A protein has these predicted regions:
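Nucleotide-activated donor-binding/catalytic signature segment of Leloir-type glycosyltransferases, i.e.
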Residues: 1-25, 29-32
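Amphipathic alpha-helical segment in the mid-to-C-terminal domain
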Residues: 20, 88, 105, 118-126
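Short alpha-helical segment that forms part of, or immediately flanks, the ligand-binding pocket
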Residues: 21-24, 28, 47-58, 68-72
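Acidic donor-binding loop of glycosyltransferase active sites
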Residues: 27-45, 60
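Structural loop-to-beta junction motif characteristic of Rossmann-like glycosyltransferase folds
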Residues: 31-32, 52, 59-62, 79
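A short, well-ordered alpha-helix in the C-terminal region of glycosyltransferases
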Residues: 90, 97, 104-118
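C-terminal alpha-helical cap of glycosyltransferases
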Residues: 122-139
């Protein structure tokens, strides 16, 4: 944020923290969901960021900068832009592709939503959680 102020960047917006329920409205105005993490190997397979699932549910293509299961899923489902970590060039290229091909972006968003519904159905996941919690309580 300080860098944006220092360099007078007016094309970057920082929002205050918001409630989870307000995210859908904020994401409705977005073109791409960006999941950017530090290049830490433990993140490749050991994270499951909520924002990834929020973007899928909102029908947003996902741009992610680290390898691992999420990048593989994005590539396999063609619902976004998996880019290598620590590659500003790949990041810029992905943003240019997103801006230059709105039809492709829309298709990716549709596939993101389909992925959310097919692989991560809320009701089924909630039922699985209830089953686990009931097992723990009974143990």
């Amino acid at each position: 944020m300080l860098r944006c102020q220092r360099e007078n960047l007016d094309n970057v917006i920082f929002h205050d923290p918001m409630k989870k329920g307000d995210l859908a409205l904020a994401m409705a105005g977005a073109d791409v969901g960006m999941q950017i993490l530090a290049n830490v190997e433990a993140f490749y397979y050991g994270t499951s960021p909520n924002k990834f699932f929020d973007y899928l549910a909102a029908g947003l293509p996902v741009l992610t900068n680290y390898p691992g299961w999420i990048a593989g899923l994005i590539k396999e489902s063609e619902c976004g832009f998996p880019i290598p970590p620590e590659s500003p060039e790949a990041f810029a290229d992905a943003l240019e592709q997103a801006a230059d091909d709105r039809a492709r972006l829309s298709s990716m968003g549709g596939r993101a939503r389909m992925l959310a519904e097919s692989r991560f159905p809320r009701d089924e996941l909630a039922n699985q959680l209830v089953d686990v919690l009931e097992d723990v309580i009974q143990a």
